Amino acid sequence: MKTMNNNTVKMAIISDLHVMAPDLLVNEGAAFERYLNQDRKMLRESLEILDTLVVDILDQKPQLVLVTGDLTKDGEQMSHQLVAGRLQRLVDAGIQVLVVPGNHDINNPDARVYVGDNTVPADTITRPEFAKIYRHMGYDENSRRDPDTLSYCRDITDDLTILAIDSCMDRLNTFVSRGDARDHCKTSGNLEASSQQWLVDQATAATAAGRKVIAMMHHHLVPHFHMEDTLAAPYMVDGAGQLCQRLVQAGVHVIFTGHLHISDISQTNLREGTMVEVATAAAVGYPCQWRIATCNTAAGKMQLRSMTLNSLPSDPDFAERAREVFKSCIPTMTHGVLTRYWPEITHAIDNYRNKHDFVMRFVDIPDSPEAIAELLLKHLQEPVTQAYITFAEGNEGGSDNQQLINQLIKGVDKVVDQTVRGILRPLTKAALHLRIYGTFKLVLRSILEDLNDIGTSHETVINDHTAIIPL
């Protein structure tokens, strides 16, 4: 394949399609409702959403489409076949399509067929099968492949290279059907040292040849809020800071990601240079967005704008309905997250109790994920829902969110009032305000005021929907 020889490349970026093949839903029932209630995805409409996206992308006439992972609901083979078939329409129109896997896409124990109140396993796929299914979308002889992962490097023009990074840990997924203790799909991202070196070598060579290099990956490389690597670690690739530094040194200054279903642009300033991360929301759930970017390699910049999927052929009010589904899922998502991570939560509580035995004698922490969920929802549901929606929509800094920050802090105070007994209650609240609330406020401000590198001399706000980004 010959590369294009022009300096300007128009591209579309889509992420987190989460397509569910219609045949996986044999009969409606409690099993599928349980799955829907703990999520914000519009799974019934997922194939129609992709069909509509394909039409909209064709209307834009890009030369390149990037898909940053989670192509399927849960790695079902039949879902992958449908996604590849739809994306092939773009390829047939002369558009290059490049994909990378997300944490849902391969070797997934949650691949299920829904039959009324029950489920049965659906066929999932292996890593070689992923490369075979998407062979015309990055995994052919025109790409240079990492021998150990699904990462690859692709020259798009004489001046532009795409570094496609596989950050998934599906090799560690467990299956009861294979003798494991539980079904578990790893959400986190990781890159082995050898793969990191391969990526750095590819980027270094492309930069030395005079090409601009843009990366794509499912997991985040740059935090989208203060302490994301601690508070939402599964959404960031392990060792993100060091990897980011190495990629910047190799000449990479822009990366497209997905995973968290948000429209947000984050930036970090290192001694070696700047890295800008463009996270694209999921069209399959609110805010139902994707991106158009025009790269001018001669000028060394990229112009970016967001696109919104407002309607479907079957639903003219699709985006608004998706927003209501998003809001309604907060309680069940809270229950689901606490239940899923309950072993880790109890381990952290026990460690804290062992270190602060005297204080913890006066603290009544609920002993089940359900009880903790109800406590948090009682005092925090409304402000957390609004904060989450504001974060997902992007451009949070465009409105005054101080009142929302105050509501969140008051909600935490009420949780303390209900869990701390006796004389320690005012002391505990005072300690929280002194030691923890400063950090808590930084986290909230970084989200609700859209601040990058908060608290540093590089603190800045970037327009999440219309931006000019240096390459």
Task: Label the model's feature ranges.
Residues 82-197, 271, 292:
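Extended active-site neighborhood of metal-dependent phosphoesterases/phosphodiesterases
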Residues 2-12, 23, 149-164, 169-181, ...:
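Beta-strand-turn-beta hairpins that frame and shape the catalytic cleft
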Residues 1-9, 314-471:
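Non-catalytic terminal accessory segments
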Residues 15-16, 65, 70, 83, ...:
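Divalent metal-coordination and catalytic microenvironments
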Residues 57-64, 96, 161-163, 178-276, ...:
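His/acidic metal-ligating clusters that form di-metal
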Residues 1-80:
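N-terminal active-site segment of His-dependent metallophosphoesterases
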Residues 18-48, 75, 116, 171-191, ...:
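Acidic/histidine-rich helix-loop elements
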Residues 20-23, 73-76, 103-111, 170-173, ...:
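Active-site environment of divalent metal-dependent phosphoester hydrolases
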